[in-house]
Amino acid sequence: MDFLGIAGKTFLIFGVANKKSVAFSISQVLSEAGAKVVYVVQSPEIKENVSRILPGSDIYICNVEHEQEITKLAEDISRTHPRLHGIVHSIAFANYGTRLKPFHETRKNDFLQSVDISCYSLISIVNVFKDLLDKNASVVTISISTTRMAAEPYGWMAPVKAALDSTICFLAKSFSAFSQVRFNSVNASLLKTSASAGIPGYLDYYLFAEQLTLRKKALETREVANTVVFLLSDRSSGINAQGIVVDCGMSVNYFDKNIIDKTMRV
């Protein structure tokens, strides 16, 4: 029995860069369930890499900072995939550089570029692709488990993700005027990905977060992917304009007794 009911359906995924990408794990779960996956990557170099790990796949190139490229992308995809049953937006970027800076020293250009790529791109993508979306399609983006925890290494990306969380609600309301397309986010806690490796000091925070999980085992990318695919399926038809937190219980365990005991003994 196909519980998810996504076999034979077509999904567009933005953001695969390598095998450690969240988007890659999502594509694997979709493919295992019998879905058709179409990929969008940022550059020819990334396309070459993704072609090696996903041979024979439909892979398109689009730099989402340029709206004309998104428009052309939709035109190109429509020729071979005129109906999409879902879109995965797994795109984020922050120009952290090599030195961790205090939040108040955030440069305007860096902040606005992050908003453009990590948040506004979703608005632009769904607007351009709206005529290709099935009336019951699902759009899922990747956010973070909390934007209220001021973790220094993540810097201005937390406010950017907060904007993304709000954007989900407004897109859901806006699209409801002419369709039943749903918009949700999967709000994941710390993951071991290539992108996160570029965040200054990330590893220490990742290992600490692992100790805060109720199971004392870090969140796996595959677990995030499973949640995304559920939201893409009709089995989640009653969920719209929501952020589903996937953090292995970390958010209720900031006062973990073992960690407190170790800290107080120092």
Please report, for each region that a protein language model flagged, where it lies by residue:
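Canonical Rossmann dinucleotide-binding motif of NAD(H)/NADP(H)-dependent dehydrogenases/reductases
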Residues: F3-V40
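Catalytic loop of short-chain dehydrogenase/reductase
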Residues: G15-F24, A92-D131, K135-F178, N187-K192, ...
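Conserved mid-core segment of classical short-chain dehydrogenase/reductases
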Residues: C62-T71, E75-R79, H89-L112, D131, ...
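Short, small/polar-rich loop/turn modules that mediate ligand/substrate recognition or access, typified
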Residues: Q180-R182, I239-A241
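Conserved SDR Rossmann-fold cofactor-binding beta-strand/turn motif
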Residues: R182-K192, L232, V245-D247
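A short C-terminal helix-loop "cap" of Rossmann-like NAD(P)-dependent dehydrogenase/epimerase domains
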Residues: I199-T213, K262-R265
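A conserved structural motif in NAD(P)-dependent oxidoreductases
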Residues: T213-V224, R235
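Short C-terminal tail/terminal secondary-structure segment
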Residues: V229, N240-V266
